[in-house]
């Protein structure tokens, strides 16, 4: 039982890590697009 809980916890950590890095990448893309848009306005 404890092993199953440990496995679920480990999977959760991996998913959280993956989601966090994915979110950072999308944020970088959004920031670069926003900067380009700002330059276009000025």
From Swiss-Prot:
Superkingdom field: Eukaryota
A Pfam family: Ycf70
Location relative to the cell: Plastid, Chloroplast
Main location class: plastid
Keywords: Chloroplast, Plastid
CC annotations in GO: chloroplast
Family: Belongs to the ycf70 family.
Name the UniProt record assigns to this protein: Uncharacterized protein ycf70
The organism of origin for this protein: Triticum aestivum
């Amino acid at each position: 039982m404890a092993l199953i809980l440990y496995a679920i916890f480990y999977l959760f950590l991996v998913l959280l890590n993956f989601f966090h890095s994915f979110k950072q990448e999308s944020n970088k893309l959004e920031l670069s697009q926003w900067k380009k848009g700002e330059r276009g306005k000025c």
